[in-house]
Amino acid sequence: MKHQRVIVLGAGVTGKSVAEFLHSRGSYVIGIDGSLDALNSCSFFHERYLDTIEEFPEDMDLFVRSPGVKPSHSLVVEAKRRGIPIVTDVQLAFQDPEFHRYPSIGITGSAGKTTTVLFLVHLLRSMGMGAFAMGNIGVPILQAMREKGIRVVEISSFQLTEQEIETPVLSGAAILNISENHLDYHQSLQNYSEAKRNITKCLQSVESLWVGEWLSPGKSYLDYTKEIASVLDKGSALKPLYLHDRSNYCAAYALANEISNVPLEAFLQALQTFEKPPHRIEYLGEKDGVSYINDSKATTMSSVEKALIAVKENVIVILGGRNKGSDFTSLIPILTQTVKHIVAMGECRNEIAQALSGSLPLTQARDLQEAVSMAQSIAQPGDVILLSPGCASFDQFRSFEERGDCFRQLVGDMEALRV
């Protein structure tokens, strides 16, 4: 990459990690972003332009698109028209010799990626192996690949979109599931699905692809569930696991076996000491007979459905936020089985009301605080108040984590919960 002229579109956390990496490889880096402050906060750009730039920089060798930048962006379209290779940070990492020093695993899917990545790292470390989580999990891959150990990479559909360069580096990979998600970005489920399946272009061998649910081609890691379930269901000392969690852990088990032979006993021991990340069907406690569950990570209809299946009945569910192109009517079958009342909040509350008001009692709330207050006024002993929004958080919050923390604080404003 030495002496190459490279455009980096996006100067957020990922874009800055890309700029630093390219600078270290001797590239001439041109940064483009909608924020001048973001551009100026990165010292690795040789030139800086706002994304309203009218003249496309000349003689460019490479174009790096930050994951959040849509392929329809005018500068991306122009780069494609000029025949300039377009990559993401993940593709850059996969092409770099430093990444190849250790085995690597890639994990993608609509839901469960972070839990699976973190458990796989935990499992490998419990067996004495160095392993590191990186990628879409919040740790830029171009920074984390400096670590000495197995690379476990969470990869989003954004990072796999328009995978123009095949980089067969992964020792194993999993597509956990595919359901409607980010349709505001990908425009169709087919485009979204194709982006996820691009992970196969990164595999050393397609025989090392593991898939869940009805997906094909690939080996099904769900084959492990029978063996593992038989152990878990025999009075195991392990805490109860939701069905979707079992699926995620089985995926990690299958992928770990692509690296090394992992005894079932080692897997079960790792389960005993693993702490699931927050905001994922997280039980907060009970007060006055009402239970509270934080599932702020649920930003798709499929994730909401999994939460409702896990909780089962007497649910007051808080839905809403910023819709990502999902169809709320797809929830009607599971809602009518498990939910007694819907509280629709935020930017798309009217849209939710139009889609669901005929199926169940529904109340609208302007924001999360009002939604929690309304849910509490409706709840009776034995009920569950479940925050499982099925939407992005950006109408009220900077992230799903901030939304979940706010829910926890609102719940914590009451007397101490009994956990």
UniProtKB/Swiss-Prot annotation:
Keywords: ATP-binding, Cell cycle, Cell division, Cell shape, Cell wall biogenesis/degradation, Cytoplasm, Ligase, Nucleotide-binding, Peptidoglycan synthesis
Pathway the protein acts in: Cell wall biogenesis; peptidoglycan biosynthesis
Coiled coil regions, renumbered to chain: none
GO cellular component, one term: cytoplasm
Reaction(s) the record says it catalyses: UDP-N-acetyl-alpha-D-muramoyl-L-alanine + D-glutamate + ATP = UDP-N-acetyl-alpha-D-muramoyl-L-alanyl-D-glutamate + ADP + phosphate + H(+)
Protein EC: 6.3.2.9
Biological processes, Gene Ontology terms: cell division; cell wall organization; peptidoglycan biosynthetic process; regulation of cell shape
GO molecular function: ATP binding; UDP-N-acetylmuramoylalanine-D-glutamate ligase activity
Binding sites annotated in the UniProt record for ATP: G109, S110, A111, G112, K113, T114, T115
Keyword Cell cycle among record annotations: yes
Subcellular location: Cytoplasm
Family: Belongs to the MurCDEF family.
Function: Cell wall formation. Catalyzes the addition of glutamate to the nucleotide precursor UDP-N-acetylmuramoyl-L-alanine (UMA).
Protein name in UniProt: UDP-N-acetylmuramoylalanine--D-glutamate ligase
